[in-house]
Regions:
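Ribonuclease/tRNase effector modules and their secretory precursors
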Residues: 1-104
């Protein structure tokens, strides 16, 4: 599957978050996906899903929309909460990412 994104957003992500869509695509191609979920606010973001991508033991949430011929990546969000849950899972401990709050 092909990926697409806004080049201006990618430049902003590189400058402000020190990560890029190219890095995310590399990790997706390596299978570094912890989970995929529907966006929790489907009214505001219909048909949007979220990749939870593992980059150096840290979770980045990547909202995306699946189109006919490609997947459009919206942004990259570092997530402390998801990383904590991911690390607990790796240690074999129980976790619940959305128990306390519905938002990531």
């Amino acid at each position: 599957m092909k990926y697409d994104w806004n080049p201006d957003k990618n430049n902003w992500l590189k400058k402000n978050r020190n990560i890029s869509f190219e890095q995310i695509i590399f990790h997706l191609s390596q299978g570094d996906i912890w989970m995929i979920a529907d966006h929790p606010n489907q009214e505001k973001f219909p048909n949007q899903r979220i990749y939870f991508v593992v980059v150096e033991n840290y979770i980045y949430m990547v909202p995306h929309i699946i189109k006919k011929d490609f997947i459009f990546l919206k942004t990259i969000i570092p997530s402390r909460k998801a990383t904590k849950a991911f690390l607990k899972e790796k240690e074999g401990k129980p976790w619940n990412l959305i128990e306390k709050k519905k938002k990531f």
